[in-house]
Every structure is written in C-alpha cells, then in structure tokens.
Amino acid sequence: AMFQRLVAQLNAQGHRCWVPKLRPIDGRRGIHDLACKLKQYVDEQLGPDEPFALVGFSMGCIVSRQYLQVLEGARRVPAFFAISGPHEGTLLAYLYFGKGARDMRPGSALLTHLKMTEDRLSQVALHVYWTSLDLTILPARSCDWRLAADRLNSQALLHRFMPADRKVCADIVQR
C-alpha cells in the first residue's frame, strides 16, 4: 500500500515493479540479514545479471546500500532512489531493540563501513528524497545524503507519507 502510487505510475510507463516483503520487518536480525534476503529475492525474480533500478524507503535505504556496496549489487543497478533513508543514522534507533536498530544508530559499525565504501557506488546514479519535517529520522538531515547529485526536499509532513508524495513519485517516474 505504501508504494501503491509509485508502482502504479511506473507500471503505466511500462516498467515492471516488484515490492519485496523482507522479514522480519523490524530488522531484529540486522541490516545484513535483510540485504541477503533482498539479494535472494532479486536473483529469484530477475536472475543473477539483469540490471534494474532500486528504490528504498527508510530502513530499506540502508538495506539497499548494504546490498549495493557489500553484496555487490551495484554492478547491476544503474540507479538507486533513496527515500527518507537514515544514511547517517537516527537517534530513534536508541529506543528500539534488535540488531537492525543498533545498525542504524549514528556512528554504528555498519553505517561507518557503508560510508567508507561509498566509492563502490561510483557507477550508480544516486537520487535522494527527504523531508526536513521528518520526525522519524532524527536529525532529518541524516536523510539528505550528500553523495547524491540529485537531492529533493519534498517538505512532506510525515516520514511515512514520503513514498506516496506527489513530488517524489513524479521525480522518480520522470527519471
């Protein structure tokens, strides 16, 4: 439901879309566990070599980056669209249990490793969407990933509205 608007618009443009349901959704086994499940899902749906554009939302952005940078997904992904991802962590991760929450704390080993291996994304077009009004990713500027040449502050009122935000969807569809 969260990606319904975006998927409908992309399908109307002739794109095939998949929305994997990675479990556990709270990431209690860690970001790497979910990234491995993403890789398996992609390989099953598309085969091991077919290129595809990747869209991530929130924790899914960090899962996607782990897939791209650590599991070598970058070799087949020409474009990554990161929607409200805590690229520099979120303070709210201190309030939640589980390895995934620890992975998303500012300065975590996982986020530090992703920062140090950003060069692996040199062939991937990076597009970032964030809202300065985000109250889930604290501070909100953690979503404004400076590595990306294309960064859009949509001013959406809530974090959860970002994947359906009209400006975000329109920008992704036109790329």
Stretch-by-stretch model annotation:
Residues 122-175:
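C-terminal catalytic-base region of ester-bond hydrolases, centering on the histidine
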Residues 9:
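Rossmann-fold NAD(P)-dependent oxidoreductase module
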Residues 20-24, 154:
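A short, mixed-charge helix-start or loop-turn motif at secondary-structure junctions
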Residues 1, 5, 13-20, 28-125, ...:
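Serine-dependent carboxylesterase/thioesterase catalytic core
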Residues 25, 88, 160:
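Active-site loop signature of alpha/beta-hydrolase-fold enzymes
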